Regions:
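Long, terminal "pre-/pro-" and other extracytoplasmic accessory regions
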Residues: 1-88
Length: 88
């Protein structure tokens, strides 16, 4: 008998984010990525969707044209940049 383990945590995050976008609670990731491209040119390496301190956030890791890696944290409800940190 085969038993499935169920969706992976990343899949659950995706489903939760999609439901929140459809309900109008948060902005779609595409909107945030458009803003990131305009404000912080580079190549996106990773995106995470989380709930931190009572708010939904998109954490975006990118590499700029100088090869520096940055972690950006945006409020998923209003696209406000909450944190910008250069990774070492």
């Amino acid at each position: 008998m085969l038993c499935g383990a169920g969706p992976a945590p990343a899949d659950e995050d995706h489903l939760q984010a999609r439901a929140l976008v459809e309900a109008g609670v948060i902005l779609p990731l595409e909107r945030i990525l458009d803003q990131v491209a305009a404000e912080h040119p580079g190549r996106v390496l990773e995106v995470e969707f989380e709930r931190e301190q009572g708010r939904y956030v998109y954490e975006i890791e990118l590499v700029d044209d100088r090869g520096r890696v940055w972690e950006l944290e945006y409020d998923a409800e209003n696209a406000k940049l909450l944190e910008k940190e250069r990774e070492d």
